[in-house]
Amino acid sequence: MPEYLILVTPAANRVFGGQAAGLTAAELEICAGPGRAAVSGVVSMAGVDYIAFQASDYAAIAETVAGLSSAHAVFERVDELLRPVELVNTDRFADDLVTIPKYQGKTNEQFTRLLVNVTAASMSRRPPGPISLLDPLAGRGTTLSVGLTLGYDVAGVESDVKAVEAYAAFLKTYLRRKRLKHKASIDPVRREGRSLGRRLQVEVTPEAGGRPQQLTVFTGDTRQSAALFGKRRFDLVVADAPYGVVHGSSAAGRRDRSPAALLTDALPVWAGQLKHGGALGLSWNTYGLTREELTGIATGAGLEPVADGPYLRLGHRVDSAIHRDVFVARRP
């Protein structure tokens, strides 16, 4: 069976870069699906690390490999030589949509794409049309921009009005400079005479053409996400939970550095916004909440956790205060 080697994209963050190959190996195993890629793991050739795998039908997984979060180049191994294999880029937008914004607390872009990829691969039912993604902790839109890049329709909720305004300003400038056909507005939202905050609405057609994609972000409390979106349901819910360092949640009128209080209240709301067969993907700091505790919250919300094999190899160190892991669950 032919053997292939993936060269991992260099990472500006040294700590993440040192762990990226192992994370991408697990990502490939999840995203390729059972029996389509026999992943050997990380191997070294001439002092350079690669992800090694075998595939009898590479063409069947070519788009999956090209879409991995850290795939920089792919080679077919021929004895001691490496033959380059073309990476077919299927992204709908250039990667600078995700990489240009720089701000304190921004989650690593490569990891964000891994989180979205793994969650999407875990759906038990593929939608007949475009995939829809909700980030109920949207921040300044990294996950939403990754979703747009992958061709999804995206939506979010964010309590920080200034973060939404900053994301709106970036999008308007970016789309204008790229000369992409689009409509963008940020407007107040009122229902039954009450102000519910503001809504960012964007419709954009990628440079390559095709169908327009939709982005909607509400300002407000993520616990009210279902009320904000009404009957709308999503194929994916993807969120970067508070790490308890820069982020936090509010409980009983005080700042809570653990994500437990927020997730206990909000996760059942998010679960109800998933379509049947859809998947939820969370990244969180295991120093503030154990996997067992998070599993209990998810099962109590009617979700079915996916916690075996490569799903248990996605944990990694961020810094001395943060050990980040990935939790995935499906709505039956």
Please report, for each region that a protein language model flagged, where it lies by residue.
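N-terminal auxiliary segments of SAM/dcSAM-dependent transferases
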Residues: 2-82
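Class I S-adenosyl-L-methionine-dependent methyltransferase catalytic core
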Residues: 1-27, 77-134, 138-332
